[in-house]
UniProtKB/Swiss-Prot annotation:
GO terms for molecular function: ribosomal small subunit binding. Monomer. Binds 30S ribosomal subunits, but not 50S ribosomal subunits or 70S ribosomes. It comes from Nitrobacter hamburgensis (strain DSM 10229 / NCIMB 13809 / X14). Keywords: Cytoplasm, Ribosome biogenesis. One of its GO terms (cellular component) is cytosol. Its main location: cytoplasm. One of several proteins that assist in the late maturation steps of the functional core of the 30S ribosomal subunit. Associates with free 30S ribosomal subunits (but not with 30S subunits that are part of 70S ribosomes or polysomes). Required for efficient processing of 16S rRNA. May interact with the 5'-terminal helix region of 16S rRNA. PANTHER family: RIBOSOME-BINDING FACTOR A, CHLOROPLASTIC-RELATED. It is found in: Cytoplasm. This is Ribosome-binding factor A.
Amino acid sequence: MPRHNKKDSTSGASQRQLRVAETVRHAIADILAQGHVHDPVLEGHLITVPEVRMSADLKLATIYVMPLGGRDTTDVIDALDHNRKFLRGEIARRVNLKFAPDIRFRADERFDEAERIEKLLRTPAVQRDLAPDSDES
C-alpha cells in the first residue's frame, strides 16, 4: 500500500507552521507598534497585523496588514516593502528559527469582504427572502 507523505492541499497548515506564524505575527506587531521603523508613512499610521502565513519550509512569511481606518493601504504596503530588509532582521532577532524567513506584505482584505457581505445582506431582495411568510398558517 503506497504511503503519501505530501499533505493534502485542503488539509491546511501544520501545527509548526501555525505556531511559527503566530510568533512572527507577534514579533512584527511589536516592531510596528513600538515605532522601530523610521519611515514617515509608517509613523503616521497604526498598523494591525491580523494574520501571518508561513510556507511549508518556514522560509517565507506572508504578512497580512491593515492600517487602522483602512486608508493609504498601498502606501503602507510600499513602505513596509521598502523596509523589508530591516524588518526581516528584527524578526530574525526575535524569533528563534534556523533561517530567518523571507517576508512579503499583503493587504488584509477580510474587512472589505465582510463589509461587502453585510451590504448584500441589507439589500431589499435579501431582506424579502429572509422575512417570515405571513401566508403560512
